[in-house]
């Protein structure tokens, strides 16, 4: 169930606004637009199905069901004038759609970033830009797109590794992201969109001497000739034989 709670009021006064007569096995996730006007509920059922609903809190009209029994997962990323959808519907490695609040129905969604051979892991909106994190050959990549899905640039990461959590606000020109690797302790960076650069905010303290550790990515073929990626982590200068 989803309840509306107003800060400062007793929880007993909370009003149930979603889930009446819904499947008890559904798990609702909630997103709200920056203006606070449009509320989304993504009712997930397992890892294959979910239905997406939207409600205009200003007009208080009935819920609009944007998807109905569609095989796929949907993540709503609200922005000021549009909302974006990250989904694996007909795209196992995910893609991005763009839609308006005025015409939010599924048939009006426009694909702006198609599926590629790499997995799209996360999507964030920052100051009218789309920040995408992807997994490419077991390595994280970080990209900046404009709000229509045109690639602007790739953010250079410190080394081969994994991008973790990305935290952003829609109306500011920077965002935070975490990064770590075999020879790079977990670090939080602040990336400035205007300056096109990042600064280190925090790094996990450790006594290990990471400068003495070398990381290489190599490829080999499995029994059925499938290419397999493997990382070699060893002391710098070690002769491999």
Task: Map each language-model feature to its residues.
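Peripheral, non-catalytic segments that deliver or gate enzyme domains
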Residues: 1-240
